[in-house]
Design a protein with these regions (language model features):
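Intrinsically disordered, metal-sensing/regulatory segments
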Residues: 1-258
């Protein structure tokens, strides 16, 4: 039951963010949007380090001086995976007029949802891998640590759902349709997490690689998309403050979890 709840928490964050379309008349002000993007970046970087990379290295201590290999290899593969997906899957980022990936005839709204869905893949994997490690009774992953990651990603997902649904409404879509598309962008997370957990018995031997793989993919999203979007135009300093706040909150949450374990 705890595991099921844990993998649904990030999706709940996306759903709540998308639900803002029922309460807000206009798009989020640029200043607030920059703050949210910076905050999301800080949360994801902190989660990548403390919930994924460090446990990956701790699990590889038996390799002695080569303990860094699983973390390094997995991290690199995670970045390459998202880079490949970015090139192959047609998608459109907010504020951009030209779609990325392979050329296709998909509607603009569909490609907007695909862009966020693409970035939610590693987050779902990250949650699934961590809970799989917890179920496998790995001493380097606690239930509190797994929930800290899940809650952190949910916090990051809230502005994502919001940033998708409000622009869709502004472009003429109904509130319900905008909410549905914003919510749909996050459905890949619980699905990916559940599949990962179901394969737990098979992935345990390569868990360090999978943890760092998820970290690499999440860092790619931050560096490739979130930070550039947060830095463009005015209010870039607000994004930096948001990054610091998100990073510190995740650090405090992680420290609290370690004290309770």
């Amino acid at each position: 039951m705890n595991t099921f709840l844990g993998i649904l928490i990030p999706f709940a964050g996306t759903t709540l963010g998308a639900a803002c379309v029922f309460f807000l008349k206009n798009e989020i002000k640029p200043l607030v949007q920059k703050m949210l993007l910076g905050f999301a970046s800080g949360v994801m970087i902190a989660a990548s380090v403390w919930s994924l990379l460090i446990p990956s290295m701790d699990m590889s201590e038996h390799m002695g001086k080569l303990a860094f290999i699983p973390a390094a290899v997995g991290f690199g593969l995670g970045i390459l995976f998202l880079l490949l997906m970015d090139r192959l899957i047609p998608h459109l980022h907010l504020g951009c007029s030209e779609p990325e990936g392979k050329k296709c005839s998909l509607k603009k709204n569909t490609m907007l949802v695909l862009a966020v869905t693409l970035h939610n893949i590693p987050e779902g994997m990250a949650v699934g891998v961590v809970f799989a490690g917890m179920l496998a009774k790995n001493s380097d992953i606690s239930m509190m640590g797994a929930f800290a990651l899940s809650i952190g990603i949910a916090i990051q997902n809230f502005p994502e759902g919001d940033i998708i649904s409000l622009p869709l409404k502004s472009e003429g879509n109904s509130r319900l349709r905008a909410f549905g598309m914003g919510t749909l962008s996050g459905i890949v997370e619980p699905i990916g997490a559940l599949v990962t957990i179901l394969l737990a018995s098979y992935i345990t031997p390569v868990l360090p690689y999978l943890l760092s793989f998820a970290a690499g993919a999440m860092v790619y999203v931050v560096v490739e998309e979130l930070i550039p979007e947060a830095s463009e135009g005015d209010h870039s300093n607000i994004a930096t403050i948001g990054f610091a706040v998100g990073f510190v909150i995740m650090k405090i949450g992680r420290a609290s979890c370690r004290e309770r374990v």
